[in-house]
C-alpha cells in the first residue's frame, strides 16, 4: 500500500524573516536566449547552513540550482568569509571579489516538538542588501523536500519564474535481463532520490501519468493478460480499471481539470482517441479513422489536443479541438513524429522524431512552426515537461546498453543530464508542483 508521508506529512509555514523581501531580482540576471541556445549561468554562492543537517540541505540546494543550467554555484574553497551568523549581513566586499552575483545563507534547527525549522536568506552582494528570506517547518525525514522548496524560492526570486525542484516523477523502473525484464511503476523526487515502488512487477506497466492533483496516476497495465488503462490512488494504493472496453486501451492522460482521462482504444487494426468522464463514466469518441491515432495530450487550457496519427502513411503530429473537430497536421519535417506532449505554458509541443536511423527529442510551436531538435541519439523517447515548461525529461536507450536511462534537458539543448535511478528507467512523467 502506498503511504502518503511525502504528500501530506510536510507542513510548511513560510514567512519573511529580517529585512524586507525585494521584488526585483539580483542586478546580474540570468541571460537566456532559447533561439541561439546560449545561457550565461549566474555565479551564486551557497554557503553551508548552520545546524546538524545544514551542510546536506545546502548541498541539495546547490545541486538543484546547478542542474537548472541557469546558475553556477561557486566552489566553497573560493569563499573568503566564513558565515557564522546567517542572520547578520555578510561582508559584501568579500563576495564581490569572487563575483558572487547572489549569496545564500541559512540554518537548520530542531524545535522542541521534534520538527525541523529551515530558514534561509538570499543576498545581493553588489547591491549590498537582502533580496528575500523565508523559513519552513517540517518533519526531519522530509529535509530534502525543504531543500527543494528553498531552491524553488531562490529560482523564482532571481528569474521571476516558478521553479520545478519540489516535484516528483513517476516512471517505469526496469530491472533484470532483456529476456526477463521486470517493470514496476515507481515514484521519485525530480533529482532521482527517494525512489519508491508502486507496483510489484508481476504485470507489465507502461506510460504512467500524474493527475493535476498529484494524488492519482493513470497508466497502462497488462494485468490478467488484458491491456487496460488503470487509475492508481497514491495515498491508498487502490487501483481501478478505466472503462471496460472490448479492445486494448493505452496512452492515457488526464485532462487539465482532472475530470477526464483521454486515451486510445484499439479496434481491430485501428485505434482511435476517446475521453472518459471520471464521474459519470461516459465516453466520447474524438477521432474516427482507419489508422492508428494515439498519444493524446491536452493543451493546458483544455481547449485543444495534440496526438499522433499514421493516417498519412507514417506517424505525424496532429492538433484538434477538445471536441474532436478541426483535426490538422502540424509536423512536416523529414522522418516520423510521435509522443507529442503540450508544454504547461501552452507555447510549445515536445515530441519524439525518428529520422536517419536515430531518435531525437524536439519542440515545435502548436502551429508546427519553429521546430527545434534538442538532442539526438540511438533511441531517445517519451518527453515530459517540468511544471514550469523550461525543462524536459525523457528516456534513452544507448546502442548495446543493458537498459534505458532517464535524462533531463532544458530548452536550450545545452544542459543534458543523467537522472540517476537505482535501476533502468523509462516512460517518465513529471508532476505538478507540490503543495
Curated annotation (Swiss-Prot):
GO terms for biological process: cell division; protein import. It is found in: Periplasm. Keywords: Cell cycle, Cell division, Periplasm, Signal. Residues 1-28 form the signal peptide. The keyword Signal applies. Residues 288-310 are annotated as: Disordered. GO terms for cellular component: periplasmic space. It holds the Pfam family TolB_N. The keyword Transport does not apply. The Tol-Pal system is composed of five core proteins: the inner membrane proteins TolA, TolQ and TolR, the periplasmic protein TolB and the outer membrane protein Pal. They form a network linking the inner and outer membranes and the peptidoglycan layer. Belongs to the TolB family. Part of the Tol-Pal system, which plays a role in outer membrane invagination during cell division and is important for maintaining outer membrane integrity. This is Tol-Pal system protein TolB. It comes from Rhizobium leguminosarum bv. trifolii (strain WSM2304).
